[in-house]
Amino acid sequence: MALPQGLLTFRDVAIEFSQEEWKCLDPAQRTLYRDVMLENYRNLVSLDISSKCMMEFSSIGKGNTEVIHTGTLQRLASHHIGECCFQEIEKDIHDFVFQWQEDETNGHEAPMTEIKELTGSTDQYDQRHAGNKPIKYQLGSSFHSHLPELHIFQPEGKIGNQLEKSINNASSVSTSQRISCRPKTHISNNYGNNFFHSSLLTQKQDVHRKEKSFQFNESGKSFNCSSLFKKHQIIHLGEKQYKCDVCGKDFNQKRYLAHHRRCHTGEKPYMCNKCGKVFNKKAYLARHYRRHTGEKPYKCNECGKTFSDKSALLVHKTIHTGEKPYKCNECGKVFNQQSNLARHHRVHTGEKPYQCKECDKVFSRKSYLERHRRIHTGEKPYKCKVCDKAFRHDSHLAQHIVIHTREKPYKCNECGKTFGENSALLVHKTIHTGEKPYKCNECGKVFNQQSNLARHHRLHTGEKPYKCKECDKVFSRKSHLERHRRIHTGEKPYKCKVCDKAFRRDSHLAQHTVIHTGEKPYKCNECGKTFVQNSSLVMHKVIHTGEKRYKCNECGKSFNHKSSLAYHHRLHTGEKPYKCNECGKVFRTQSQLACHHRLHTGEKPYKCEECDKVFNIKSHLEIHRRVHTGEKPYKCRVCDKAFGRDSYLAQHQRVHTGEKPYKCKVCDKAFKCYSHLAQHTRIHTGEKPFKCSECGKAFRAQSTLIHHQAIHGVGKLD
């Protein structure tokens, strides 16, 4: 049967772009190009699935010089030569769509099709595809980048003048200059009667008249492809027909569900050839690969900065535009990235989805968890190039580097103070503004830093996460642990520039420096007394208020200072953590150890200005001064008798109470004063520590020695 000779060409509905025009298209326009191509492709395939056809495909890689072949589809009513494998075609349509989406996500150029027409005969077809086998057209690895063009044509020798003219006209177009998205379809009028009822003819007529037959009433947007219309409709209607059977999450596209499922299966099919790292998305692999190549193809037109990811460039551009389109519904704070908004939202919800497998501690950010893990692993990836000191956090390294450079680039506009870090400047500014946005839910106390609130919260919870490996003592603050460790190591990093004396704490150095300067900047408004440190002034003020808010749980005794309660608590526990390296004697407080140490050194740094007498303990000097001033600040409430020492008052009060707390272990005799017990104990031991320098006679009590020395005419001892 002779094939009809009449032809119809669709050249007039072609959508063509030059290379320069193509680069100007935005992603949405390129996606439209893809959808039009696919619609044409499917419509042509669906014309007559039972008909015999032949197809050839190959493509050109972007920037390569491979020969371009055009896929051809031939109706051969009288030739039963091989059958088109339409399932293969549909499979490749799906592969093309998926790969396009991967490339778009990856930031690659969208696929483009370059056209070159071929004419052929059934003889040529017979030679290439003899054997009546299904055609397995070879698409190759580059099919994802280029969709082949389809032609339906009649066998050579039966083509009319119109067909030859159409082909000649088409071949005159420069394929190196044009990129075409069109079905160059040549069909006889007889076949065309059926064809005019297809969606392809409708699409051709719509494009030719610049009309769009699919319009969405919600947005007013029109489309010339039903597939585009359906996709757009899904976005507005919020329809998500693809559901994950594991977690129930819904998606509006099947490919999104396929990507999501890999989260549950752990599948990571894309592997890096360089380092072996695997990824669940091809886009992630491509992005990772740029780390090896150093490629940064995305450039900011404003400042020239380049990026390896398109998303990073888009985020960067908001710096120039100042755009922050993502707003928090809770507090109104705006962000330039949706991820930042999502992260911020956890502040309101309290969500902490990232949990440490070692200690079960939870975090609101993945970066916080990774940073925390280094505590368990001991990893310190940030190393100083000057002194090789390593740090867990990059911020800690940045702080440390300032020691070497002494650079403090961040300056406060209010007071001119400079800082090595911008975060430190921001915290400092709250001093001027008085802003304290962080409030404790337990007691209502407010803080200017979140870290201070977190630290304060441990007072309510009793949490002490920092433990000393030497003595197992625990602390609520890391700085307290580091300070405590110096007791074991003997480290004294704070050195006086005047006398080279070293100290474990910077506060102790500050106290010591006043000895040289004599400065006491902190003054009490009640009594006018001045102090070296603000903490000392705060402690002093309690004397005027009489407040004793620190109570011992063991005996109920109250104290006006927390440190005093801590010292007192050691009476119950028997703890004496401070040991003398000379004689091994242990003490409850560090000050007691320091005083004791002067017995070995003979140091007496405290001198009376009246009589030049020297003392090894400051409190002894203050007590001695009362000899000159006659001051007796401690008064008995019963008989109004006054004393120069609080210990004397305590002893005296036992006269009224009859209390004798000091008991001899040998004979059970009790005494009001500890000194009386000590003197009595020598009766049992026979010890006589007080010896006369004139005659060598020894005595149990110092008072007895003084009385004896009067015989020799020696004056009383001071």
UniProtKB/Swiss-Prot annotation:
Domain of life, source organism: Eukaryota
Gene Ontology biological process terms in this record: regulation of transcription by RNA polymerase II
InterPro entries tied to this protein: KRAB, KRAB_dom_sf, Znf_C2H2_sf, Znf_C2H2_type
Any one GO MF annotation of this record: RNA polymerase II cis-regulatory region sequence-specific DNA binding
UniProt keyword annotations, A-Z: DNA-binding, Isopeptide bond, Metal-binding, Nucleus, Repeat, Transcription, Transcription regulation, Ubl conjugation, Zinc, Zinc-finger
Paired cysteines (S-S): none
Record flagged with keyword Ubl conjugation: yes
Chain intervals annotated as zinc finger (C2H2-type): 214-236, 242-264, 270-292, 298-320, 326-348, 354-376, 382-404, 410-432, 438-460, 466-488, 494-516, 522-544, 550-572, 578-600, 606-628, 634-656, 662-684, 690-712
SUPFAM superfamilies linked to this entry: beta-beta-alpha zinc fingers (SSF57667), KRAB domain (Kruppel-associated box) (SSF109640)
One Pfam family linked to the record: zf-C2H2
Descriptive protein name: Zinc finger protein 888
Gene it is expressed from: ZNF888
